[in-house]
Amino acid sequence: MKNKIYLTTLFIFSLLINQYFANRGAFPIDSFLSFDAAFNIISGNHPFKDYWLITGPFVDYIQALFFLIFGINWMSYVLHASILNTLLCLFSFYYFLNIGLKNFYAFIYSLGVAILAYPSIGTPFIDHHSVIFCMLACFSVSLAILSKKNLFWILTPIFITFSFFSKQIPSPYFVVLFAFIISFYFFNNQNINKNILLNLFFGSLISFFLVIGVFLVNEIPLENFLVQYILYPISLGEERIDKLNIDFKNLISQFKYIYIISIPLIVSTFFLAKNKKKNLIKKNEFIVSLLFLGSVVILIYFQLLTKNQVLIFFLIPIAAACSHAYTIKYFNNKYLIYFIIAVFIFTTTKYHIRFNQNRKFIELVNADFSLAEDAIQLDGRLKGLKWITPHYIDRPLDEIHFLIDAKNILSKKSGRKIIVTDYQFFSSFLNNKFTSPNKWYDELSIPDRKNKYYDVHKNFFLSKIKKNKISYLFFIGKNKNEMYFFEEFFNENECIISNELSELLLEFDISKCIF
């Protein structure tokens, strides 16, 4: 009965906390990442085939499903992220119980996970999806070892596949970690279920057919996928690794609380490794702790590679729970338990205020939220969102008026058009089914002139304009038209006629051009 109360409370809390903080401001390029992309899929336009995409197709397809069920609106958009936050929270609770925590402590640490996982951004985001699915896979392997339930072996490759198609990394690193851990598990256990490999294969087969089904049904060219999702991002990854800045601040200082809270677990794992008389339970506990610590290392490396705001602080309550459980088993020191709980409460509060309340992840840490406006003024489908962005941080109402003007002008423009913007809701609001040839436009999504895939992207872009007989390019937002790709495009085609329609809206008439 008590477990049901805990589970119900966790379900409601993890869902509502994300729904609440997702409404607290927006950072257009991140907050609306999959809004129009999901609309494009519903309209019959698919990633890799109809628009250039270097990461995140799984997020787009799942969001399209949410839009089909709940309608194209802000609530259903945020609900997608909230449900994943809930899934991680409930999985964490079950995992904490299985590593030996009492119900109450498992409940408290799970609340911490719900607070620090998805609410930092609140809306569907590729980095959060990829990391959370990797953690779910980590939990699945651990639970498969501890509980001996075949379901978790089946779920592991499915979660890894979902992570990979949310973002390419860190899932490959987790595959290597899992291969090592599972091999070690086989080597150290004599009486092992021989169906483990069969269950892993079955989960992999389910994942394979899901992916192949999407590709075949939607006629997505394999070559496009390989170039956009594998080969071109690899070229970017090589550059990022070369430029990786590993100094004290990046590697130690910003993750210090993850390290501190993990110390009891690390010490316990060390003693378990030195104990040559381990029984089966202790062997499994050693493997599970090693798996989690390996996951922490991978996610810290991933965070350094992404060079984004830190999103892995939800590891703190998980590490606290693991340290708590292993301290009880191998130290039984109440003062150490008090220390773990104190660090957990302090850090959860600290990062909740920084990332949820002050919205640091979406660059609103200096915002005065009393200035935020109801986004319903812009469109009824944004009901619930309190509009304030970093672009007009002191003038959110002005930004809304500029966007309303752009929306009204575009709604009256006849002719086939594509919209280039970070405000990725205009296509869905205007029911414009001619998708932009790129999901979004930034320095990474579009290959640099020096990149060997520059011409591949350029030809892809031009082919979509030609195929869809596009007459107009509209740019909403500042400086998008000044990107090197568009500067070259405009310089090479003197037939293009430009027109500034408002502060945020530029029109480029390409109807007289032949591509």
Feature map (PLM): residue ranges:
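Extracytoplasmic catalytic/substrate-binding loops of multi-pass membrane glycan-assembly enzymes
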Residues: 22-37, 47-63, 72-75, 218-222
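Membrane-interface alpha helices of multi-pass inner-membrane proteins
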Residues: 152-170, 174-179, 293-304
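Transmembrane-helix motifs of polytopic, lipid-linked glycan transferases
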Residues: 79-103, 136
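Membrane-interface transmembrane helices that cradle and orient dolichyl/undecaprenyl
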Residues: 98-100, 135-155, 163, 187-190, ...
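Perimembrane helix-loop-helix junctions
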Residues: 173-206, 327-329
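Short acidic/glycine- and proline-prone juxtamembrane loop motifs at membrane-interface regions
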Residues: 122-130
